[in-house]
């Protein structure tokens, strides 16, 4: 835990909760009569409101993207390596907004929130939300903050999908889109991984149809298994081999079915257990479904070029060689469509052994390229 914060840290930060009374119509046909969004901001909004950057989080992310909530915090925000003074998203130049999306479990309205219509926890009654719904709620957030146009919308993985959707839904409100380790839609394999994770949760006896909070229980077993499956897909074989290999946790093999014998087993169990204590099961179901549903080209005859013909932003896409969850080929699909649509796009494939999680890591070439692009953005 830091006693003095590094010079390149945004330091102590405090979240804000913004309440919205205007009904939000959702893709599903349902609506939210009112809702909260929890945000953090870093840096200062300039007089012309031209330096605002929106950070869109991935599946298990939230509003705490940088800095510390207290001097006792063991770790900073989830993208602290990229946000702060002198970092790629330089808070000396940019006003940075990070939020917890609707359906999340870190303060924004979601399944774990109180339904104002009933006075009870939403649970399974919270409506399905999509990437398009998130972007519409983020546009209202921008209005509330007095931001007419984002200098950049930035995200990795599911966050990159939101950044891409911003350029489609609100082309005039985004100058630059940074879409990192992402894809124009999920592959069948990715949908399959998500379904296995969902089934782990749904089959937990303590899930109780999504109303587990009313009974004072948590489907920890299902959440743990879901996270273990997901975590395997976020790492590359090289990364797992380098980190764990076949190293034993025990002195020798026990030749039974119940011992945790390999270090990699212990690691996955720890990650799953830790996740199950801080994340909401209904939120996990919603987030994975939002991933599955994302397919902006579906409304344009499955033609991604046509889908992107109306965008006005300049684009930067980055992918990582060992990412097999969202492989470089998926980023190149977007790049090729943008080129065919005659849009400005930069692309970098970064040699990194960490797999999908590389977009969260302080990899020198990645940070250098990220900084290089952000420094070109005029504010």
Curated annotation (Swiss-Prot):
The record marks 325 as: Important for acyl-CoA specificity. Gene3D superfamilies: 1.10.1740.110, alpha/beta hydrolase (3.40.50.1820). GO terms for cellular component: cytoplasm. Keywords: Acyltransferase, Amino-acid biosynthesis, Cytoplasm, Methionine biosynthesis, Transferase. SUPFAM superfamilies: alpha/beta-Hydrolases. It catalyses: L-homoserine + succinyl-CoA = O-succinyl-L-homoserine + CoA. GO terms for biological process: homoserine metabolic process; methionine biosynthetic process. Belongs to the AB hydrolase superfamily. MetX family. Homodimer. This is Homoserine O-succinyltransferase. It comes from Pseudomonas paraeruginosa (strain DSM 24068 / PA7).
